[in-house]
């Protein structure tokens, strides 16, 4: 008889003031930077930045996402998963979600972004308000198999504009830290 494993617990997302132990300075600098990650990655890559869409579809949102968006568990929403790349290397895995009802009311065509960065949209539209950044060690089983690793730092923020809330999670992959070590002046 096969033995089934219990589901892995969801991570505990924490704001900066509640985080302990605190990551090193270089990691914290990237985790808690409130500017555009797209712009920062573009600068680090000397404009060799690109976005590779992995998933763009309606799905049942994870319970931690529903809680962050103030939705009932098992709510349906738009899920967009991408790699943010520098020089063709996946530096960041990003997952953005929004409730179906909020997207319909909010007038944002997130499903039409394709290979464009969501960050461009969020930081160019001054009507969006960013909520506090939360961080965690992102669960390996939530990552694409090609980059699945234990203990990777992730961050997330909710961006609000009227009835629309988008939850954006960004997981920093080992290749990013390698690039930062090679080009500290570009950070």
From Swiss-Prot:
The keyword Cell membrane does not apply. Pathway: Cofactor biosynthesis; ubiquinone biosynthesis. Signal peptide: none annotated. It is found in: Cytoplasm. GO terms for cellular component: cytosol. Keywords: Cytoplasm, Lyase, Pyruvate, Ubiquinone biosynthesis. Its main location: cytoplasm. Its EC number is 4.1.3.40. Removes the pyruvyl group from chorismate, with concomitant aromatization of the ring, to provide 4-hydroxybenzoate (4HB) for the ubiquinone pathway. It is an enzyme of class 4 (lyase). This is Probable chorismate pyruvate-lyase. It comes from Pseudomonas fluorescens (strain ATCC BAA-477 / NRRL B-23932 / Pf-5). GO terms for molecular function: chorismate lyase activity. GO terms for biological process: pyruvate biosynthetic process; ubiquinone biosynthetic process. InterPro entries: Chorismate--pyruvate_lyase, Chorismate_lyase_/UTRA_dom_sf.
